[in-house]
Amino acid sequence: MFLSKPSVYICLFTCVLQLSHSWSVNNFLMTGPKAYLIYSSSVAAGAQSGIEECKYQFAWDRWNCPERALQLSSHGGLRSANRETAFVHAISSAGVMYTLTRNCSLGDFDNCGCDDSRNGQLGGQGWLWGGCSDNVGFGEAISKQFVDALETGQDARAAMNLHNNEAGRKAVKGTMKRTCKCHGVSGSCTTQTCWLQLPEFREVGAHLKEKYHAALKVDLLQGAGNSAAGRGAIADTFRSISTRELVHLEDSPDYCLENKTLGLLGTEGRECLRRGRALGRWERRSCRRLCGDCGLAVEERRAETVSSCNCKFHWCCAVRCEQCRRRVTKYFCSRAERPRGGAAHKPGRKP
């Protein structure tokens, strides 16, 4: 007997977002509608890319996308309804849609190909739609059925999660790139044909990180929705907010501090960055953000690293390298005595 679609989706996504890297889709999707099983590996890969992007975007934040945050299932994991939960839902939804769209364009699915629905139509002054646009409509439709099926409730929390799932999909569509090819005599560009391509997924992650910082707090009772009137009020409230924006119901906790009840480790012991030509402003200020503003000192530790260097190709056919040792300095947040005049942590500061 086949499982119902929602049951299959819930099984799939709950298992995909476990942090063990040894999972296999085939282990938990042995049955189900065959029409949807063909997408399961793409959904798994998309969910994993969302996890990795979350960790990248928040690597130097007080909340750094910890393992317990990476389950979308309401059966345990994301108990809070704060802006971090909003981001996890959005980036996971975006990752699934992005991967399905990309794999469609690569020809991985027999029932999907380029989006040429607008080919030949005037797109703007001097250019027409043409070529092979990535089929985001397909990726959006399939990912919506997989991801949104996790939400079986009708309360404010479920509405929030569905809204942020949609914001993730909108982020993929909103960051698509227009690529054009010139046509004309002797290399002139009299007219152009253009198509839409997916950006690097890193751009989608950066876009959603900006939305995270601007996330809107919705003032609703989370238990609302048990009555027709309550559900109507929730629906009206969320309809008034653009689906391009992230929303949350609760304020974030103080991520500086350890909180075993919430599963928060605090920032003590976290590594931070101070120097490096390639560092951006956010990374260079990580010691202040993770340590100083949390009432911790910055501890300097020296370590020796070993890496391959002076590699040479020898005919035929081997590459031989030397092992070079290098002393490096790393910085960590420590409970050690702070220098005089250091700022004390102020609870409730923005994470």
Swiss-Prot record:
Palmitoleoylation is required for efficient binding to frizzled receptors. Depalmitoleoylation leads to Wnt signaling pathway inhibition. Proteolytic processing by TIKI1 and TIKI2 promotes oxidation and formation of large disulfide-bond oligomers, leading to inactivation of WNT8B. Glycans are attached at residues 103, 259. Changing residue 53 to Q: In a colorectal cancer sample; somatic mutation. It is found in: Secreted, Extracellular space, Extracellular matrix. Expression is restricted to the brain, and more specifically to the forebrain. A lipid is attached at residue 186 (O-palmitoleoyl serine). Keywords: Developmental protein, Disulfide bond, Extracellular matrix, Glycoprotein, Lipoprotein, Secreted, Signal, Wnt signaling pathway. GO terms for cellular component: extracellular region; extracellular space. Belongs to the Wnt family. Ligand for members of the frizzled family of seven transmembrane receptors. May play an important role in the development and differentiation of certain forebrain structures, notably the hippocampus. This is Protein Wnt-8b.
